């Protein structure tokens, strides 16, 4: 069960990294470039790789807690 949760977290983390990557097709296709610039630059002026790591760790912890409800992880 823990292996499945870990694999799912790896997929989610990879998808988040893909979305926050520099030049990718999904970001450029679904969101206009000026909207991306306005939203990201005003919301995340210091959005560095450290910030990405913090967000990924928090998301992974939340997913583990959310999926681990009712599952004895001891």
Swiss-Prot record:
Keywords: Membrane, Transmembrane, Transmembrane helix
Keyword check for Cell membrane: no
UniProt tissue specificity: Testis. Expressed in several cutaneous T-cell lymphoma (CTCL) cell lines, in head-neck carcinomas and carcinoma of ovarian tissues.
Ranges in coiled-coil conformation: none
Cellular location(s): Membrane
Membrane topology: Multi-pass membrane protein
One Gene Ontology cellular component: membrane
Membrane spanning stretches: 1-21, 46-66
Predominant location category: membrane
Transferase as UniProt keyword: no
Miscellaneous comment as given in the Swiss-Prot or TrEMBL entry: Cancer-testis antigen containing the epitope FVLFLFGGN which is detected in sera of CTCL patients according to PubMed:12839582. Tumor-associated antigen found in several cutaneous T-cell lymphoma (CTCL), and in particular in mycosis fungoides patients and in Sezary syndrome patients. Detected by 5 of 15 sera of Mycosis fungoides patients and by 2 of 3 sera of Sezary syndrome patients, but not by any control sera. Expressed in around 35% of the tested CTCL tumors.
Descriptive protein name: Cutaneous T-cell lymphoma-associated antigen 1
Lineage: Eukaryota, Metazoa, Chordata, Craniata, Vertebrata
